[in-house]
Regions:
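Active-site-adjacent beta->alpha loops and helix N-cap segments on the catalytic face
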Residues: 10-24, 41-45, 61-85, 91-99, ...
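Catalytic cores of alpha/beta
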Residues: 42-49, 92-110, 160-175
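Long, charged amphipathic helices and adjacent flexible linkers at domain junctions
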Residues: 12-36, 76, 281-293, 297
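Solvent-exposed alpha-helices and their adjacent loops that cap or buttress functional pockets
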Residues: 23-30, 49-51, 78-81, 99-102, ...
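Hydrophobic faces of well-ordered beta-strands that scaffold small-molecule active sites
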Residues: 6, 31-37, 57-59, 86-89, ...
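Active-site beta->alpha loop and helix N-cap motifs at the rims of alpha/beta catalytic domains
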Residues: 30-50, 54-56, 63
Length: 302
């Protein structure tokens, strides 16, 4: 038979794959992409997103424990069966997780009010500490798996301030993390880089802020004049390129895992020992009782 060329591999492609061995690609060698949907116009939005090439969908809402999410998931299953992966959330307890898992969610997001630009707890008084919510939901996930044989991954959404918080969330049971402020700081973020008081910053705002006006994520109906903000419009300190920063963050996560004697996330969750610490313990965990050199720029050698 006549031989035909199947594909062409360029040096640049090989170098890119070698430099980024963990990249997630589809069968056409495109990056996997997720898209958010709401529980209002999903019947028009979801087909359009899938036609555009979205690989996974997630119902984007501040409150996932609702019949609206159940109806949205049911519609997706009716139209596409199990061929379309769709996550749901957000929830903060066992009941919320079990509700979405039984509804057919492929993964569940955990966290209400813990995001850096979210003020849902301040304005409505609902939410829960991220660690408490995550531990309870992950226990419910394991309970559901033992009872049904179906494993529904959990995403920790919110509360990540320092890199070690990523490792803590994974150790508490999260299968993966959602990061907003972390990525908003980088060149790749589509927002503007501006100078504020001599420091470069990147714009960052919540979907519930007046600027975004994404009331479909939060609104329960009623007159528009009754809508109120559940997010803020803010700046985050500019941090340079995504590649360099993610590499450092991943190195820190791996280093902590090694300290725990773990070579994988499941092993970390098995071996990590979580303990409650006091405020003084947190202070003593950093530098203290010294004057940092970078805080005293005008040093004269005597």
């Amino acid at each position: 038979s006549r031989r035909q060329r199947q594909m062409c591999i360029r040096d640049r492609d090989y170098a890119s794959h070698k430099e980024n061995p963990l990249e997630l690609l589809d069968d056409q060698k495109r990056y996997l992409v997720g898209a958010g949907v709401n529980t209002r116009d999903y019947q028009e939005r979801i087909p359009a997103l899938l036609a555009a090439g979205a690989d996974v969908l997630c119902i984007d809402s501040s409150e996932g424990y609702s019949c609206w999410q159940e109806k949205t998931i049911a519609w997706v299953r009716e139209q596409y069966g199990d061929s379309v992966k769709i996550g749901a959330g957000n929830v903060v307890d066992r009941d919320g997780f079990l509700f979405l898992a039984k509804a057919g969610a492929d993964f569940v997001k955990v966290g209400i009010g813990g995001g850096s630009i979210c003020i849902t707890r301040e304005t409505k008084g609902i939410g829960r500490g991220q660690a408490t919510a995550l531990i309870e939901v992950c226990a419910a996930r394991d309970e559901y798996y033992r009872a049904t044989g179906v494993y529904v991954p959990v995403c920790s959404d919110g509360g990540i301030v320092y890199d070690y918080h990523m490792t803590l969330a994974l150790a508490m049971g999260a299968d993966f993390l959602m990061l907003g402020r972390y990525f908003a700081r980088f060149d790749e973020s589509p927002t503007a880089k501006v100078m504020v008081n001599g420091v470069y910053m990147k714009e960052y705002w919540g979907e519930g802020s007046n600027r975004a006006r994404n009331w479909q994520r939060y609104d329960l109906g009623g007159a528009g004049k009754l809508s109120f903000e559940e997010g803020v419009d803010s700046f985050v300190t500019y941090a340079g390129s995504l590649h360099d920063n993610v590499e450092i963050s991943l190195y820190k996560v791996k280093s902590t895992m090694c300290n725990c004697g773990a070579l994988s996330i499941p092993e970390l969750q098995q071996k990590a020992k979580l303990t409650v610490v006091s405020s003084p313990s947190i202070v003593e965990g950093g530098s203290h009782d010294v004057v940092l050199k970078n805080a005293t720029p005008n040093i004269i050698n005597g």
